[in-house]
Amino acid sequence: MAENLLPRGDDLAQQENNGFGPLFKRRGRTAAITSAIIGVSSGAMLFLAVKEEEKKTHFLVFTAALLTLSFAFGELLRRLSLVSEEIQHKHTRHQGKWKSVFKTTFTFDHGGCISLTAMFSALILCYQLYEQYEVFSRSDFAILFSVNCLVVPQLLFLVGLRQLSPVETSDLNEKENKNVADGLAWSYYFGYLKLVLPHLKDQIAKSEQFRYKIKKKKLFILLPKTCFTHADIVDADPRVKWAGNLPELKISRGGIKDRIYKHAVHKIEMPRPDGTMDEYHFILEYATSLMTLYDMSQHADAPLSRKERDHQVVLFIRKLREILDKSEECRGSYELVPISGNDPNEIANVLVGMHNAANIEVLAGNHDQANGVIRPE
């Protein structure tokens, strides 16, 4: 007897965004906050454990300052090994400038904070040595400082413990726009969307064929998770048929006089219960930049795994949304439509669903306005 199983949480998550799946957000400050909590709580527990004994308290403070200062100096010495490598590339990477060699090697994101911590540690050491010179001037502490400054940083570097984890690398790339997806999103915006979207409503108004048929005067951009874009959308969903093009938009760009840009209008027919048909017209196209990700995943010289491609397509959508949300020229002229790319009948259903949902929202807003109702944001 077949069992009726409820969908699991993972299955429900994969149904989000028209079957595309969840779109993750930027990483926050949780890791830094957790690290701070661990550091402060550990230091507090150590201090509470020795606070009754003055000698141990002084030892704890002195040792913490000593290790902190030795770590700072050790990092500077470790970076000298990086300088030795950069010297080999001084003329090709740094235009022969020593200043560039040292600047790129010894630059810290939080240099001010590091300097302040090192100075504070040095002051503590000086004070402790002044107060209890006989206790802390032993050679044991000098050896500890030397090992932690000269040996440990180099050892950690050589065995690979200083290598960034995949999480840290991903976070760094996202923050500094170094992902493939970030470059593709910016290129798609500057090379296409920023040029055509500001003129979209004018192009619709110029079209005698479609000016009254197109109800949603936006460019609907299909974003399949598979990254594969069909040459004709009808191949992805037979119900989405090409109906014609809007008037051509001519823009001189990149040395090409009157380069032509044009948008395709697609028609969807959905049957009613009484047998008649509802017609919907959309300005519809794929985000062609996604095909680059698909091609990279298929090319031997540009290895991009399926898992990494799935990651990059989400980054592309997120970055593109961030860019367009901040663009005054493009506001109100686009609709991003993430889809799974696997269902042959999903495009028509998704677009009609978005169209009807928008109409219901407008009708609800008009009804509230007529009755003096103010909905909370």
Curated annotation (Swiss-Prot):
Taxonomic path: Eukaryota, Metazoa, Cnidaria, Anthozoa, Hexacorallia
Membrane-protein topology: Multi-pass membrane protein
Subcellular localization, as worded in the UniProt entry: Membrane
Disulfide bonds: none
Family: Belongs to the STING family.
GO cellular component, one term: endoplasmic reticulum membrane
Pfam family for this entry, one: STING_LBD
Function text: Facilitator of innate immune signaling that acts as a sensor of second messenger signals produced by cyclic GMP-AMP synthase-like receptors (cGLRs) and promotes the production of type I interferon. Innate immune response is triggered in response to nucleotides from viruses and bacteria delivered to the cytoplasm.
Protein name in the entry: Stimulator of interferon genes protein 7
Taxonomy, superkingdom: Eukaryota
InterPro entries: STING (IPR029158), STING_C_sf (IPR038623), STING_LBD (IPR055432), STING_TM (IPR055434)
Assigned keywords, A-Z: Immunity, Innate immunity, Membrane, Transmembrane, Transmembrane helix
GO MF annotations, alphabetized: 2',3'-cyclic GMP-AMP binding; 3',3'-cyclic GMP-AMP binding; cyclic-di-GMP binding
UniProt record, GO biological process: activation of innate immune response; autophagosome assembly; innate immune response; positive regulation of macroautophagy; positive regulation of type I interferon production; reticulophagy
TM region positions: 30-50, 57-77, 106-126, 141-161
